[in-house]
Amino acid sequence: WGCGGNMTPEYYANEYRRYQTYVRNYHPDRPIKKICCGANVADYYWTKGVLNTAFDHAEQWHGFMDGLSLHYYVHPEGWEIKGSSTDFDADVWYKTLSKALYMETLIERHGAIMDEYDPDKKVGMIVDEWGTWYTCEPGTNPGFLYQQNTVRDALVAGITLNIFNKHSDRVKMAALAQMVNVL
């Protein structure tokens, strides 16, 4: 789905099953974890399609995976115009926090789909991209995706980490994108 891949969930899952075969554990003390590309935000169709195909005739519970990823960014003004990281009013402040709370809905709904295929929760939800994402700061290189963080971002992080903790039976790993992807 992402970065121009333009794949259907079924096609991707078949490709995933094919190529994961060649990713093997070579050291018993350092097992490789296979993470399947999951949904962007509320694309429940993707989650259902990938799991349905990946788990079809799969050995026992795992659908050839240890985790399924999920991406969600909080951008208060929308994807095209994300809003300023430092110049915002109270309305945008509350809108940002409200959108942070949406992470719980995403985890619950994607988790419910995962439960259909993996009721024992052996496949982890891997929220490998999350956080706030605003319009690049004026005067900075847009390719570097620099944004100044504020107390508002700390509250988004606190809300989100609390949600992850609450759903730790399914969420097994999370990566704040600003730490990993230089936002």
Residue ranges and their predicted role:
Residues 1-3:
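Hydrophobic or amphipathic alpha-helical targeting/insertion segments
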